[in-house]
Amino acid sequence: YKSTEIKSIKYYDSKSKEWIKFVPLMAQKSLPSVWNKNPKPYKTPIFLKPVYEGKNVSAYIHYISTITNTKTLHLEGTNYVFYFKVKNEDVAKGYWMGSSIGAKMLLKIVFKPYPVMKETVSNLDTKEFYKDPISLIRTFDSLLK
């Protein structure tokens, strides 16, 4: 199947004994940075796992894997990128990837187009954010009208 042809895809996780749903959405290719404040989206929708559905904003997780090969080294890793999508916008925006270094600076860049989040991000308790990154999107949802 192509991501442009289906509304969702589910698979059964035998470890958790649960069905896991993924939805295709247009999403940014990378997290924003000081050099690229608004990353371009992928050319086609990618599959994201919904983790929060609010009135104004939804949150998603994108599972990723990386492989790096050199002459003397082979590294493999898995991680995830947290995304949010405002209801009236076309592209999901990445807001966090699990790194504790520079998280608040990144969030200030991500949420700059949303003035309602300025105070929340400035006063963010990063330790609490690391424990539950989706809590920030729940707050964002409650602040949007």
Locations of the language-model features?
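C-terminal partner/receptor-binding element of secreted or periplasmic proteins
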Residues: Y114-K145
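Aromatic-patch recognition
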Residues: Y1-T120
